[in-house]
Amino acid sequence: MQIKVINETNKTVQIFQCAKVKHRALAWLCDVFLLAIVLVVIFLITQAFSDNRFLLFLVLSCSQTILWTVYFIFLPFFWDGKTLFRNLLKIKLFAFDKRFLRIMIHELFLWILLSVLFLVIASYFFINQNSSEALNFFTNLDKPNAIAITIRTITILISFLQLIFIGYFCFSSEKQALQEILSNTFMVQEKHTLKSKPTSLKTNNQPDPANLPGVIALDEVEKLIN
């Protein structure tokens, strides 16, 4: 799938090729892994200064949101649609208009799925002082409770949405992925072809009535009479 961008200023046409699945997946996984390392560092630093699990959960939740927003929204907005690993793999996120809004919609699609999992599951683990009790709270089917059922339902729905996303993503090589269709963006290869815009010459195709067959100009009639 090719994307053509016409520049009216210098009369050129840029032709981009949509990125392959392996490049997009590798860039995204490496970017997420990088943010996970930063979150682990924040976790260790916070834990060294405080044993309050609720404070630890609050710090990690805020840190996750801030890191994701800065790295996946603001950085691509100011860096031509690229993150660190997108730049290394020579791909970028392209949008024709409303770039900030398009990028935000593109990244929020995945951020919501991962954040809901983090907030729903991690909240109880960080607040509860006994991790084994927390695990038993979710896995004990003999004593079902409303909270556990709700969390399981949300987890199943999110997992189902993730399977749809991954399945569509696997068959979208050199095409738009699902979140790109929803945000009207394109993950393209940085290398592109530059061509001159073809110019069409405007010609006046209206015929002169005097030259049409069967039409005689008035001055010619006067010459014949005289």
Curated annotation (Swiss-Prot):
Swiss-Prot/TrEMBL keywords: Cell membrane, Membrane, Transmembrane, Transmembrane helix
Quote the subcellular location field of this record.
Cell membrane
- Please indicate if the UniProt record lists Repeat as a keyword: no
Q: List the disulfide bonds.
A: none
Q: Name one Pfam family in it.
A: RDD
Q: This chain belongs to which protein, by name?
A: Uncharacterized protein MG243
Q: Which InterPro entries match?
A: RDD
KW Cell membrane (keyword) present: yes
GO cellular component terms, alphabetically, are: plasma membrane
Q: Report the membrane topology from the UniProt record.
A: Multi-pass membrane protein
